[in-house]
């Protein structure tokens, strides 16, 4: 359950287009505690962890999410408010 309290500032390591979707790879201080299929909020947008590699994890934002949030405007090395 999300608390509304920002737990960490994540850093975008990589952005990769996948059709109309966007794969977002993020590093954060608690990546080692995450699990595949876990929900994590990014700038208030709940996304599901689809991959974990070292100190970074990957989520997918679909086109509708990109159209209705600021996630489509992000660039590599930008910071994200992270809540879990």
How would you name each of these model-derived features?
Residues 1-84:
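Conserved loop->alpha-helix
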């Amino acid at each position: 359950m999300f608390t509304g309290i920002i737990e960490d500032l994540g850093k975008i390591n990589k952005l990769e287009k996948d059709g109309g979707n966007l794969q977002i790879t993020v590093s954060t201080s608690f990546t080692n505690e995450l699990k595949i299929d876990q929900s994590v909020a990014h700038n208030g947008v709940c996304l599901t962890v689809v991959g974990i590699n070292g100190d970074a994890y990957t989520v997918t934002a679909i086109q509708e999410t990109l159209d209705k949030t600021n996630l489509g405007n992000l660039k590599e090395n930008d910071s994200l408010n992270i809540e879990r």
